Amino acid sequence: GEYIDSCEVAFKTFGELNKKKTNAILVCHALSGDQFCSEINPLTKKNGWWNILIGPGKVIDTNVFFVVCSNVLGGCMGSTGPSSINPKTKTNYGLKFPVITISDMVKVQEKLVSALGIKKLFAVIGGSMGGMQTLEWATRFSNKVNVAIPIATSYRHSAQNIAFHEIGRQAIMADPVWNKGNYY
């Protein structure tokens, strides 16, 4: 595979980390998500995508838990991705951005969690692609997770999933300004 020397990670936290650092929940977003899982997204001015679940007195109670949500590696909301400047070329990565995997995303999240001083997460939760990240956490870093809550996900795609995603890919490529993905 390819290697990125360093990367930026955009993230948000909600609630307070307790003194023992045992109340942290990592929320992993789906493909079209971002770090704004709760409260108002400052860019869209809309409620976070899981605002109904995360907050004071809600299912993931931020009066009890410290919630961390990062934009994944390769995302487009502040973490290093195709729109980022490649330090070697001083231009956007664009199509030259390395192919990344769920495992790569989770390795970056683990570095973030460690940088926050958290040795073991109370839980990791995510749906769809976020659920795949949750499963990766449960296998790769099982010693750093108490509870894994994968939602609407699988450890691999079915033929139907692959076909569905191909339809989406074809729709993007049919856009008149597609330019073979060369946006930069």
Role assignments for model-derived ranges:
Residues 1-184:
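Ligand-binding pocket scaffold of soluble enzyme catalytic domains
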